[in-house]
């Protein structure tokens, strides 16, 4: 048994039932919950993010929910710092951090650390945004391929946020994002919990999903329809009423929100909005599965099984995470 304190990751695609299982675990284990979800960090974005209800959050508090205004950004590096702080506080009380959510980049940031990148430069960013508007994202992607082919291969040509950030890093520092990461990795080998170090916990990685992908697709479609019935469009309408929010913000680009925003902009019909929202959520689930297939030592659970709690406890006992 490792001398490191234990932590549990409960991962899985959207609409798989992660929150329900996490709450069941807190009833039988000395765990406290930490949300790992890039949409749940935002206040006022409740319906479209499938945020647990106020009643559930009151009975089963989750850290890192409602910690940012939608006008603000929230990076993987910020998540790592916040999560490490929360995990340390939970561990100090003799309890186990139970991290639950589907933002796989956040989990990776915790496990592998992140390279220290140059701070954002407003002037450089404004110049790049102007270029994107005037010349198109394809031109920015071409520029990135010239100075950082590794990042260009990794970043989709239609991803303005990451394209601009990668070019910004190069223009501010004169060094590519790939070079920064490679140097940071070399310097951080053997480190513990620093920005590039490894996570100082013994982690049990769990993932929950239906074994039949068709069932997950049905659940995604049903949940999106339920969100619309619960007032998702009105929620986005309220966000649009704020003068400081726009479609380019990370919060508004969240799956579902950008489709409803486009609908309210008149770019989509109601049926198109519904269809594209469901498709985008399916694509998110596919990306989450891709991450999870490469995740080391993950223990899978079937969303439809009636004994997931006992299966989880048996697994945790078998790997001595609870010793």
Swiss-Prot record:
Residues under site feature: Interaction with substrate tRNA: 103, 125
The keyword Nucleotidyltransferase belongs to this UniProt entry's keyword annotation: no
One of the record's GO molecular function terms: tRNA dimethylallyltransferase activity
UniProt binding sites for ATP: 12-19
Catalysed reactions, as listed in the record: adenosine(37) in tRNA + dimethylallyl diphosphate = N(6)-dimethylallyladenosine(37) in tRNA + diphosphate
Entry-linked InterPro entries: Dimethylallyltransferase (IPR039657), IPT (IPR018022), P-loop_NTPase (IPR027417)
GO biological process terms held by the UniProt record: tRNA modification
Region of interest: Interaction with substrate tRNA: 37-40, 161-165
Highest taxon of source: Bacteria
Keyword annotations: ATP-binding, Magnesium, Nucleotide-binding, Transferase, tRNA processing
Cofactor(s) in the UniProt record: Mg(2+)
Function: Catalyzes the transfer of a dimethylallyl group onto the adenine at position 37 in tRNAs that read codons beginning with uridine, leading to the formation of N6-(dimethylallyl)adenosine (i(6)A).
Family: Belongs to the IPP transferase family.
NCBIfam families tied to this protein: miaA
Quaternary context: Monomer.
Name under which the protein is recorded: tRNA dimethylallyltransferase
Organism: Pseudomonas putida (strain GB-1)
Gene: miaA
């Amino acid at each position: 048994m490792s001398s490191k304190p234990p932590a549990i990751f409960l991962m899985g695609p959207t609409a798989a039932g992660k929150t329900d299982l996490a709450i069941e675990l807190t009833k039988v284990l000395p765990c406290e919950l930490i949300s790992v979800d890039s949409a749940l960090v935002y206040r006022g974005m409740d319906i479209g993010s499938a945020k647990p209800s106020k009643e559930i959050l009151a009975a089963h508090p989750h850290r890192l929910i409602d910690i940012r205004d939608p006008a603000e950004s929230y990076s993987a590096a910020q998540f790592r710092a916040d999560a490490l702080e929360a995990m340390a506080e939970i561990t100090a009380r003799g309890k186990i951090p139970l991290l639950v959510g589907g933002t796989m980049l956040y989990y990776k940031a915790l496990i592998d650390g992140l390279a220290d990148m140059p701070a954002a430069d407003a002037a450089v960013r404004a110049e790049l945004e102007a270029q994107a508007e005037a010349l198109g994202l394809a031109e920015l992607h071409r520029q990135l391929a010239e100075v950082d082919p590794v990042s260009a291969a990794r970043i989709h040509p239609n991803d303005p946020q990451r394209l601009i950030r990668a070019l910004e890093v190069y223009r501010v520092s004169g060094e590519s994002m790939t070079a920064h990461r490679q140097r940071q990795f070399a310097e951080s080998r053997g480190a513990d919990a620093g920005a590039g170090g490894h996570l100082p916990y013994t982690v049990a990685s769990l993932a929950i999903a239906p074994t039949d992908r068709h069932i997950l697709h049905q659940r995604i479609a049903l949940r999106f329809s339920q969100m619309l019935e619960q007032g998702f469009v009105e929620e986005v309408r309220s966000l649009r009423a704020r003068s400081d929010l726009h479609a380019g913000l990370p919060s508004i680009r969240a799956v579902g929100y950008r489709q409803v925003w486009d609908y309210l902009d008149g770019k989509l019909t109601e049926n198109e909005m519904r269809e594209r929202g469901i498709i985008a959520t399916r694509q998110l689930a596919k990306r989450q599965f891709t991450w999870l297939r490469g995740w080391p030592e993950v223990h899978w659970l079937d969303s439809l099984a009636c004994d997931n709690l006992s299966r989880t406890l048996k697994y945790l006992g078998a790997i001595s995470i609870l010793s």
